[in-house]
Regions:
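Conserved PLP-enzyme active-site core in the AAT-like
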Residues: 4-27, 31, 38, 48-54, ...
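Aromatic- and Gly/Pro-rich donor/ligand-binding loops
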Residues: 64
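Flexible linker/loop signature enriched in Pro/Ser/Thr and Pro/Gly
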Residues: 85-88
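Conserved C-terminal alpha-helix-loop-beta "cap" of PLP-dependent enzymes
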Residues: 312-435
Length: 436
């Protein structure tokens, strides 16, 4: 497609000439960076293919299984594929795990008992986990079962306070939870290497403590996963990275055999464990999504870096910045006002293939302590590997952008978000012209 054809198509989708030119100039400056993402995607794609071949995935794995799900070949083989790809002893990969929060709650409840203590050495957890833990009172929380919680605040640079972590470890500490991604914060997302250093520090002092990593938004961003650097469990959602945009539901937990067995008994029933839980016809999408995931994540990473560079040049604080290494697919942009957050999200929604005509508004979403706006014209409801953006309507008024099943769609979404902010009067068109 030549430049004239490109501009014409973007114009049909509501992008002004100035915004299109700004996008083209930004993309041109990122060619070397994008090549690095392509190389990581190639490595991870081969890793997934090897795991599938090693575990003899066959057409029979896609068969519809109902009822109890005894001897569900597709389900059992897929769990072996995940364990192979993530280099763990075992995995639990199920449509009955409804989301990332459910997977995390399951892993915690399965491996903690009354009197145990849960420690977060990375500060406050993601908002929805506050009710799981009992930071905000909720029915069925860990706190109701006599499980205590403490957290160690991060240093000013967003990294680990090792002396405070050492002081927080005590005889009650049973499990340490490490959130890889920033969530609704402006701290850094952590590299696998940094997570490995933290785990090694904890294990040197308490080898018996379980180290669990919330791996949401991080799968296939790097060539290794937290399970390669000492994590006892990694946990994630199939409507994020590993589902590749095709999985319609599901979550996974991968790690040590005993811990995964505990999770299986908690998910189903003591005595039943992994033996039940029919796959109900979703296996082909689970396999195919996992196969495509490295390439899809690559497109999302390109979109995140593109967004960082687009908004950083306009003077907005972005985390990570346009040049930093990437450790998840989330791009935070601090817009400084509710109007900015809303206009950004409306632009993302307008770029969607589904529900592009819908105008998102902030609302009191369950599990959050403030109104939240979410833009996601997705094929799978709530899928954040698809083009999406969200943010709480509270200071510092940051928006969190992620996903895009293809780089082209991620690019369109960012340009539409900028166009939306210009149309709403949040960003001046004169400022865009200055950057051309």
């Amino acid at each position: 497609m030549n430049q004239t054809e490109s501009q014409s198509m973007y114009q049909k989708l509501g992008i002004s000439e100035e915004v299109w030119k700004y996008g083209q100039k930004t993309e041109e400056s990122l060619k070397e960076r994008f090549r690095g993402f392509d190389e990581t995607a190639e490595y991870n794609q081969l890793k997934v293919i090897h795991a599938m071949q090693e575990n003899r995935v066959s057409e029979g794995c896609f068969n519809y299984v109902s009822g109890y799900g005894y001897n569900d070949q597709g389900r059992d083989t897929l769990e072996q594929v995940y364990a192979s790809a993530f280099h763990t002893e075992a995995a639990l990969v199920r449509p009955q795990i409804t989301c990332g929060t459910h997977a995390l709650a399951l892993a915690l409840a399965a491996n903690l008992r009354p009197g145990d203590e849960l420690l977060s050495p990375v500060g406050k957890p993601y908002d929805t986990l506050e009710e799981v833990i009992g930071i905000r009172p909720s029915k069925g929380s860990l706190a109701e079962y006599g499980i205590t919680y403490r957290q160690v605040e991060l240093l000013e640079d967003g990294y680990f306070d090792y002396p405070a972590i050492e002081a927080a470890l005590n005889e009650k500490t049973k499990l340490v939870t490490i959130q890889r991604s920033k969530g609704y914060q402006t701290r850094p997302s952590y590299s696998v290497e940094k997570i490995g250093e933290l785990i090694a520090f904890i294990k040197e002092r308490r080898p018996d403590v379980i180290c669990m990593v919330d791996n949401c938004y991080g799968e296939f961003v790097e060539r290794i996963e937290p399970s390669d650097v000492g994590a006892d469990m990694i946990v994630g959602s199939l409507i994020k990275n590993p589902g590749g945009g095709l999985a319609p539901i599901g979550g996974y937990i991968a790690g040590k055999e005993e811990l995964i067995e505990n999770c299986a008994y908690r998910l189903t029933s003591p005595g039943l464990g992994k033996e039940v839980g029919a796959s109900l016809g979703v296996m082909q999408s689970f396999y195919q999504g996992f196969f495509l995931a490295p390439t899809v994540v690559c497109g999302a990473l390109k979109g995140a870096v593109f967004a960082a560079n687009i908004y950083e040049k306009l003077g907005y604080p972005v985390v990570p910045d346009g040049k930093e290494s990437r450790h998840d697919i989330i791009q935070a942009v601090t817009l400084g006002s509710p109007e900015g957050v809303v206009a950004f999200c409306k632009g993302i929604q307008a770029a969607a293939p589904v529900d592009s005509y819908v105008s998102p508004e902030p609302w009191a979403m369950p599990g959050y302590d403030s109104d939240v706006i979410m833009a996601a014209g997705a094929f799978v409801q709530g899928s954040s590997i698809e083009l999406s953006a969200d943010g709480p309507i509270k200071p510092p008024y940051a928006v969190y952008f992620q996903g895009g099943l293809t780089w082209t769609h991620a690019k369109l979404g960012i340009l539409k978000s900028l166009q939306g902010m210009i149309d709403a009067g949040v960003v001046s068109m004169d400022r865009i012209r200055e950057l051309l």
